[in-house]
């Protein structure tokens, strides 16, 4: 009997239109970063550059900081279902590279955790600098568009934070 080896990955089934939209968004992010002379934090590897990764449609590497990066792989033709030839799926992996001479490790994460990590790194989310800019009347370029990422931390609106800074802490 022939031995069959299988690799099991956590994946989320998506449509081909979502994959195309994802590729477009990544390309726009890369073009925007290039136009603003920022370091490349997002890298797109098409299927022909993802060596030895069968069924990989594309691989996107998102660098969170020096030690952590997210790898988003989109797969195609995973399982031929009845009457369906093209099946697309996405997996998200967090790779942690600790200080030198230690082995890197990786884990698969959910889209919610990936959203939270990306949001906390790429948006200043009403930190002290954003509050001070708003008080001075300067334009706050990075606007928090993902308030669900702060529900656990209890971050309030930017206007409330500005009022708290101007009038001091609430006295009881």
Swiss-Prot record:
What are the inducing conditions?
Expressed late during infection in a Rev-dependent manner.
Could you state what the record's PTM comment says about this protein? Processed in virion by the viral protease. Highly phosphorylated on serine and threonine residues.
Instruction: Write the record's keywords in alphabetical order, separated by commas.
Output: Host cell membrane, Host cytoplasm, Host membrane, Host-virus interaction, Membrane, Phosphoprotein, Ubl conjugation, Ubl conjugation pathway, Virion
The UniProt annotation puts motif BC-box-like motif at: 157-166
Q: Where is this motif: HCCH motif?
A: 119-150
Q: Which family does it belong to?
A: Belongs to the primate lentivirus group Vif protein family.
Annotated organism of origin: Simian immunodeficiency virus (isolate GB1) (SIV-mnd)
Q: Matching Pfam families, A to Z?
A: Vif (PF00559)
The misc remark on file is: Vif-defective viruses show catastrophic failure in reverse transcription due to APOBEC-induced mutations that initiate a DNA base repair pathway and compromise the structural integrity of the ssDNA. In the absence of Vif, the virion is morphologically abnormal.
Question: Which purpose does this protein serve, as stated in its record?
Answer: Counteracts the innate antiviral activity of APOBEC3G. Forms a complex with host APOBEC3G thus preventing the entry of this lethally hypermutating enzyme into progeny virions. Functions as an adapter molecule, recruiting APOBEC3G to the ubiquitin-proteasome machinery. Targets APOBEC3G for degradation through the assembly with elongin BC complex, CUL5 and RBX1. Binds viral RNA and affects the stability of viral nucleoprotein core. May play a role in viral morphology.
What the entry lists under InterPro entries is as follows:
Vif
Q: What is this protein called?
A: Virion infectivity factor
Q: What is known of its domains?
A: The BC-like-box motif mediates the interaction with elongin BC complex.
- Record note on quaternary structure: Homomultimer; in vitro and presumably in vivo. Interacts with viral Pr55Gag precursor and host APOBEC3G. The interaction between Vif and APOBEC3G is species-specific, which may play a role in restricting the replication of SIV to their host. Forms an E3 ligase complex by interacting with host CUL5 and elongin BC complex (ELOB and ELOC).
User: Which GO terms are recorded in the biological process aspect for this UniProt protein?
Assistant: viral life cycle
Phosphothreonine PTM positions: 107
What superkingdom heads the lineage?
A: Viruses
Q: Where in the cell is it found?
A: Host cytoplasm; Host cell membrane; Virion
**Topology term for the membrane:** Peripheral membrane protein
Which GO cellular component does the record give, naming just one?
host cell cytoplasm
Task: Name positions with the PTM Phosphoserine.
Answer: 157
